[in-house]
Amino acid sequence: MRIAALLLAAGRGRRFDASSQSGENSSKQFRMLRGKPVIRRAAEALLPHVDVLLPVGDDPLLADSLEGLDILPPVSGGAERHDSVRNGLEALAKLPEPPDLVLVHDGARPCVPAEVVQNVINALKTHEGVIPAVAVIDTIKKAKDGIIVDTVPRDGLWRAQTPQGFRFGTLLELHRTHRDARTDDAALLEQAGHPVAIVEGSEDNIKLTVAEDLMRLEGVIDRNLLPRVGLGYDVHAFEEGRKLILCGIEVPHTKGLAGHSDADVGIHTLCDAIYGALAEGDIGRHFPPSDNKWKDMDSARFLVHAGERIRERGGFLVNADVTLICERPKIGPHAEAMRNRLADLLKVSVSRISVKATTSERLGFTGREEGIAATATVSIMVPDNGEA
């Protein structure tokens, strides 16, 4: 059977806006969650289970957030949720091979477990509509004007989640004939007399509704991450007539460092540490010195790439510690500027970055002031399977 998914991204998220202190203007589904937009994580959770995924929404950020995924181009959303679903269904109906089954998923639910999605699909073999849900366990009170008027029995009460699954033809027909608002598509089937089955949902399948939900979602993601550590070491000789660039900052000195790029030994060793933690080789693998494209290149570009690779793998940087080894120049006066520059390039808080210096007590090539050495240690968190 051919399975399609509608990924809804037209909602504005007014409750989230009211609770957020961040000042960001983007809708909740486009907020960054451990290095990826919320909606991208939602799409990636569905893709292994479906043949076609169709985003529904008009925000310019939608295409950017889903760039590179094997999905259909977005279709416009509607004024209300049911309008967006209907627009998506009509678009699917026009495909050369319309689906047999359709999943409808909120773009603000980024952490739906694979088993929940698969259980919904499996239940559609015997039901026209299926929703994942979790049983209500708290005591429910009904109130008026701040005063309790009733205690509602919780037996048989469930909290509905998505993706909700349906026979495609059934849901399309009901949307064409019932244009009044519903909070979800299961309610359409219920009103028309079609039984809708429930499968076990998950407490991890959190919908981003208020700002505090971001922390809960981060906790879900972090449970599936493993710590990794990377070490970097690099050396560059001094050379007359070049600027001295260290950790992205120009440092006044009589000499610069020799190298194919700008020879920023601090950034080079930090890149090596990051690539090592990711098990992706070293800086030379990504930016080979044999390629003249990188001749005299600002090494900031290399570090931006290394940081992007962490995020593309679904991880984040815990901390980075860079040590510069030289007799001169003195690093201390520039260390804070270096920290801030590295943090900016890696898109992390400066509190996660350390830059310090030491000497070799006038021993060896650094003691003879023939060059500068640098070491770096990084700690990152990435998914257990190493995939985004």
Curated annotation (Swiss-Prot):
The record marks R154, K207 as: Positions MEP for the nucleophilic attack. 4-CDP-2-C-methyl-D-erythritol 2-phosphate binds at D234, V235, H236, H260, S261, D282, I283, G284, T358, T359, S360, E361, F365, R368. Residues 228-388 are annotated as: 2-C-methyl-D-erythritol 2,4-cyclodiphosphate synthase. A divalent metal cation binds at D234, H236, H268. Pathway: Isoprenoid biosynthesis; isopentenyl diphosphate biosynthesis via DXP pathway; isopentenyl diphosphate from 1-deoxy-D-xylulose 5-phosphate: step 2/6; Isoprenoid biosynthesis; isopentenyl diphosphate biosynthesis via DXP pathway; isopentenyl diphosphate from 1-deoxy-D-xylulose 5-phosphate: step 4/6. CDD domains: CDP-ME_synthetase, MECDP_synthase. Its EC number is 2.7.7.60, 4.6.1.12. PROSITE patterns: ISPD, ISPF. GO terms for biological process: isopentenyl diphosphate biosynthetic process, methylerythritol 4-phosphate pathway; terpenoid biosynthetic process. It catalyses: 2-C-methyl-D-erythritol 4-phosphate + CTP + H(+) = 4-CDP-2-C-methyl-D-erythritol + diphosphate; 4-CDP-2-C-methyl-D-erythritol 2-phosphate = 2-C-methyl-D-erythritol 2,4-cyclic diphosphate + CMP. Keywords: Isoprene biosynthesis, Lyase, Metal-binding, Multifunctional enzyme, Nucleotidyltransferase, Transferase. The record marks R15, K28, H260, T359 as: Transition state stabilizer. GO terms for molecular function: 2-C-methyl-D-erythritol 2,4-cyclodiphosphate synthase activity; 2-C-methyl-D-erythritol 4-phosphate cytidylyltransferase activity; metal ion binding. Its cofactor is a divalent metal cation. The keyword Lyase applies. The keyword Transmembrane does not apply. Residues 1-228 are annotated as: 2-C-methyl-D-erythritol 4-phosphate cytidylyltransferase. Bifunctional enzyme that catalyzes the formation of 4-diphosphocytidyl-2-C-methyl-D-erythritol from CTP and 2-C-methyl-D-erythritol 4-phosphate (MEP) (IspD), and catalyzes the conversion of 4-diphosphocytidyl-2-C-methyl-D-erythritol 2-phosphate (CDP-ME2P) to 2-C-methyl-D-erythritol 2,4-cyclodiphosphate (ME-CPP) with a corresponding release of cytidine 5-monophosphate (CMP) (IspF). PANTHER family: 2-C-METHYL-D-ERYTHRITOL 2,4-CYCLODIPHOSPHATE SYNTHASE, CHLOROPLASTIC. In the N-terminal section; belongs to the IspD/TarI cytidylyltransferase family. IspD subfamily. In the C-terminal section; belongs to the IspF family. This is Bifunctional enzyme IspD/IspF.
